[in-house]
Amino acid sequence: MPNFASIWEGVADAVPDAIAAAHGLDSHSWREFEDRSARVAAAIDAAGIGHDDKVGLYLYNGFEYEEAQFAAFKQRAVPCNVNYRYLADELAYLLTNADAKALFFDVTLADRVAEVRDRCPDLQLMIQVGGGELLDGAVHYDDLLASHEPAPRIERSGDDLWFLYTGGTTGNPKAVMWPHAELQKSAEAFYRPLGQPVPTTVEAAVAAAVELHDRNRTTRVLAGAPLMHGTSGIVSLQVLMTGGAVATLPSRSFDAKELWEVVAHHRLTMLAIVGEAFSRPMLEELDRAKAAGQPHDLSSLFQIMSSGVMWSKESKTRFLEHKKLTLLDTLGSSESPGQGSQLTKGDAEQAKTATFELGDTTVVITDDGRIVEPGSGERGRLANRGVVPLGYFKDEKKTAETFPTINGVRYSIPGDYATVETDGTITLLGRGSVSINSGGEKIYPEEVEEALKSHPDVIDCNVVGLPDERWGQTVNAVLSLEDGAEISDDDLIAHARTRIAAYKTPKRILRVESVLRGPNGKADYTWAKKTAEEITGIS
């Protein structure tokens, strides 16, 4: 299997006028995408940055993010996602951990870059995206494009790397090391319309992309979450590999009206989102527009995919009331995409929450290494042997823990616990690292959150444990409610008790104006724990 850049170059040659990237209402063809990226690659090469050198992407969504990534791939360098919410210490840690030699950064983040550059001894090239005053020692992205001819194409390898830094739930961010060839295996679903497996050569991949274009089956996806997040990052690589197009939104905070306008303008076929943080405002905007007699045009949209967090049955049902769509609820992580899925095709009665069909290469394994039998009631961790990264960069201990070899088979086991039902489906319980131990019972926050969020007055919720002399820990729900909601704490707890066992229900309801989430829509349990401690005085 080849490097992504080699495939994308072939696609650009084969379908040069097709759309490759869109940002808001603007778009770039494959010809433009390849040419601009090749010029950036020339600048990287001129700075002496090449094979296995790390390139940080401290950027918001936009053309520049995808071009910088393509450019790094072209030179066999390793692009590294950098969370744009990181402040100086977090930024310095990641850049030094990665041994980053180049950094693309947004102009609004220049002050943070200035604060850390002297702490990053390997950093030798800084490229500023956006107008405004240029950071001393940096170069403007647009000047870089204008001053370089496209870099010549070179031989590459499928063993070249892509780094996906994951914050996880505890500790410093870690880079998951993905060889291009391994990650390409996860694109299987995008080749199903052709009835073929994932191509393993540039020629086969380009031929498949051309056939998808000829049959009008090319995927045009809107990456709703930031590209620096695993969901958008991985799906964008997969879609571009098939000759499709990736669209992003220009607003720095999520704007559902803008999303639906971009879907209609570019005739997008797929949305990639992250659960309820996206679904709720999207549905509210659909309802508003419909009530105003100006419904959004969903005619091109075929599928909505969510990954990374739980996606409620209620939201799925409401989407299906607007259009008969395919709803794909995928179970995966930065370390293990495609562990399972829950598919709903146009029938609201099928919509479920947190119940998934296991992928062909995924099993549930107990902590002592046994495979969980269906209907046994045992809990185990999801283990995927199909698509497995090399490990974590500079962390052999964590690599050995997360990617063990069991009975001669290497698995990716990030830590998501589940039970296996009699019919072979799994019920996701949550990540073990944030589980709550109350009276000897292990309680997973996602279970409790989903029970509470099923109440119409609850906007969002995080559940955390607080210390307790009798029980060890208690369950505490930090939640936000709809304006004007008058429901009592006791009624909320009673509602949760209709969905989950009594011992899992919250001891305390802690009300906040809004629940803080990351830009990728994922729960910020550090914030939730601190908030719960401040409200209760317990720590």
Which residues are covered by each model-predicted region?
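Conserved AMP-binding/adenylate-forming core of the ANL superfamily
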Residues: I19-G62, E66, F70, L87-A92
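Structural core segment of the AMP-binding/adenylate-forming
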Residues: A46-A47, A77-D143
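AMP-binding/adenylate-forming catalytic core of the ANL superfamily
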Residues: Y86-Y93, L103-F105, N384-R385, L390-K394, ...
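AMP-binding/adenylate-forming catalytic domain of the ANL superfamily
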Residues: V129, A501-A523
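Conserved pre-ATP/AMP-binding loop-to-beta segment of ANL
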Residues: H148-G167, G171-N172, V198, E211-V221
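Conserved AMP-binding/adenylation subdomain of ANL enzymes
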Residues: Q184-G224, M228-A272, E285, A289-K290
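Gly/Ser/Thr-rich phosphate-binding loop
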Residues: M241-G244, L268-I273, L283-Q350, T361-V363, ...
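Conserved beta-loop-beta connector loops within the AMP-binding
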Residues: V363-R385, T419-D423, A485-D489, A523-Y525
